[in-house]
Curated annotation (Swiss-Prot):
Catalytic activity: maleate = fumarate
UniProt-listed Enzyme Commission number(s): 5.2.1.1
The protein's name in its UniProt record: Maleate isomerase
Inducing factors: Repressed by NicR in the absence of 6-hydroxynicotinate (6HNA) inducer. In presence of 6HNA, repression is alleviated.
Length: 250
């Protein structure tokens, strides 16, 4: 009998990409592995990518975890990297523990992944030491993200802030622009390129091109989240066409 897994997604209300890129990867996996997935979301309000609005949104994440645990999902993914990183260094650990406890208190214990924690873990898995980052945020928020990742033990050699404050506009950013952005960055000695430090910024269509262009492994927040979900479900973390991390090399 085919095993079916319920994927729970804690989603900013204005996010339109998490529910396309993560299902796209897991659905692509179905062509090469027997497991099947369904996708279930709960939303927390956010329209402008500003620190105050992100903090207010994060306060709603507990409700989302409880709602998704009502559906007895098998894993939960919190998809707003900057909301977690803007709350303070190492906050992904606190968030994951609290939200998992919320599922346990609802008699539906399930592992909780944050895209922030997933990206940090992915960089460790890929044995990255020196990285480059592309993010859609305004510079002050991007600096918070860069500092957060540095505190997790990585050297950030170069980074780009695309300075898009409206979250819907982030989703509309054309991923075809990403290879050109990366071409202007200093990648000398870089181990891994973080092509999108944001689950809302589309990047999946550009991953293979940037890997070919740079000769370096490329990861994104969405790819890292998908990897972490598969690991949490004790499934082989392999997805065709989703970059080095999900190639089976790790």
């Amino acid at each position: 009998m085919t095993q079916l897994y319920r994927i729970g997604q804690i989603v900013p209300s204005s996010n339109t990409t998490m529910e396309t890129e993560i299902p796209a990867m897991l659905n692509a996996r179905q062509a090469i592995r027997p497991e099947r997935f369904t996708f279930h979301s709960s939303r927390m309000r956010m329209k402008q990518v500003k620190k105050e609005e992100l903090a207010a949104m994060d306060a709603e994440s507990d409700r989302c975890a409880v709602e998704l645990s009502d559906a007895k999902v098998d894993v939960l993914g919190y998809a707003c990297l900057v909301a977690i990183m803007a709350m303070g260094l190492g906050y992904h650990r606190q968030s994951e523990k609290r939200l998992q406890q919320a599922t346990a208190d609802n008699d539906a214990l399930a592992p909780v992944i944050t895209s922030a924690g997933a990206l940090v873990e992915a960089l460790h898995v890929m044995k990255a030491k020196r990285i480059a980052i592309v993010a859609p945020y305004m510079k002050p928020l991007t600096e918070l993200v860069v500092n957060y990742i540095r505190e997790e033990g990585f050297e950030v050699q170069d980074w780009r802030a695309l300075e898009i404050p409206d979250n819907l506009a982030v989703a509309r950013h054309d991923p075809a622009n990403l290879p050109g952005i990366v071409a202007g960055m200093d990648l000398e000695g870089v181990d891994v390129v973080v092509l999108s430090a944001c689950v809302q910024m589309q990047s999946l269509p550009a991953v293979a091109k940037v890997e070919a262009q740079t000769g370096k492994p490329v990861v994104t927040a969405a790819i890292a989240t998908t990897y972490a979900m598969l690991k949490a479900l004790d499934l082989e973390p392999i997805v065709p066409g989703a970059g080095a991390l999900l190639s089976g090399a790790y």
